[in-house]
Swiss-Prot record:
The keyword Iron does not apply. It catalyses: a 1,2-diacyl-sn-glycero-3-phosphate + CTP + H(+) = a CDP-1,2-diacyl-sn-glycerol + diphosphate. The lineage of its organism: Bacteria, Bacillati, Actinomycetota, Actinomycetes, Mycobacteriales. It is found in: Cell membrane. It is an enzyme of class 2 (transferase). Belongs to the CDS family. This is Phosphatidate cytidylyltransferase.
Length: 312
């Protein structure tokens, strides 16, 4: 039986443009949870190898990786928003995102907040002078002409995006600066990967009870339990032996990180559902876009930095 849109009662593949085509393209050579598993594993191992080598031999290169990820992920979301009719000031958003992460190097959290604040202010002004129908050529600005329409919608989406990607990712960069910074980054990334792998595996094998079916039909309570078990085990070990924290801090951190990973995934799923798309991009075979792999990492980075900084 086809899923229906809760607001209209019409079949979901008819009520949300692009879903039917995306579903048809994604079902070929994919398992139950919708991934091309061999490609996903190959890409995941490649990314993991780069991260491990970076953190072991040159930890500060992590900031470069964060900056690159911010640019690519922000561009993916901007493109999708524009396809849906939003008028997003991409130039100041992408440049401001770089300032947000790079200012963490000399100024730490103050730099991240200053970069984010400046990005928001410039984007709000930029949107005022953009042509509503100029989605590809932002240099065509005008201080006169027809009144700006949908300003609140577009400005709100821009501020949301500036917080969601550059600001949240800057906390991932902040993790690497202390003496045990590499261990802290390992703690974050291993926790996220363990939560994702545990949830995916258990969900595919045993998932029967949907977690939030109206947002993400493939997620199940059984998968969440798998995330909790795997994420908790991995985080306690990494927080204790790599970040130098007590086991109770690792246990508390693990529980919160599993929640933020799951909620981050659900937030991106809802955004994609609003936009009528399956993936943010096609950069990573078996995964979708880069943003589709960062959905759980971004909010988890904020939590990881906060708890690893404040707790003994």
């Amino acid at each position: 039986m086809a899923s229906t849109d809760p607001g209209t009662g019409t079949p979901l593949d008819e009520s949300v443009p692009g879903i039917k085509r995306a579903m048809r393209q994604s079902t070929k050579n994919t398992p139950r949870a919708g991934r091309n598993l061999p490609a996903a594993i190959a890409v995941g191992l490649s990314i993991g190898g780069v991260l491990v080598a970076t953190l072991v031999f040159a930890p500060r290169i992590w900031v470069v990786l964060c900056a690159g990820a911010i640019f690519v992920a922000s561009h993916e979301v901007v493109r999708r928003l524009r396809e849906a009719g939003y008028v997003i000031p991409a130039i100041p958003l992408l440049i401001g995102g770089q300032f947000t992460v790079w200012l963490t190097w000399p100024y730490r959290t103050v730099g991240a907040l200053a970069g984010f604040g400046a990005t928001v202010v410039v984007c709000m002004i930029w949107r005022l002078v953009m042509h509503d129908n100029s989605k590809q050529h932002e240099s065509r600005e005008a201080l006169a002409g027809p009144p700006v329409s949908n300003y609140l919608r577009d400005a709100s989406a821009t501020v949301f995006l500036a917080a969601w990607v550059p600001l949240f990712a800057s906390f991932a960069a902040l993790l690497v600066y202390p003496k045990d910074g590499a261990g802290r980054v390992f703690c974050l990334m291993i926790a996220v990967v363990a939560s994702d792998v545990g949830g995916y595996t258990v969900g595919v094998l045993f998932g029967k009870h949907p977690l939030v079916p109206r947002i993400s039909p493939n997620k199940s309570w059984e998968g969440f339990a798998g995330s909790l078990v795997c994420g908790t085990t991995a985080t306690i070990l990494t927080a204790t032996f790599l970040a130098g924290k007590t086991p109770w801090v690792g246990a508390l951190l693990s529980f919160v990180l599993v929640l933020t990973c799951t909620l981050g995934d659900l937030v991106e799923s809802q955004v994609k559902r609003d936009l009528g798309i399956k993936d943010m991009g096609r950069l990573l075979p078996g995964h979708g876009g880069l943003m589709d792999r960062l959905d759980g990492v971004l909010p988890s980075a904020v939590v990881a930095w906060t708890m690893l900084t404040l707790l003994p």
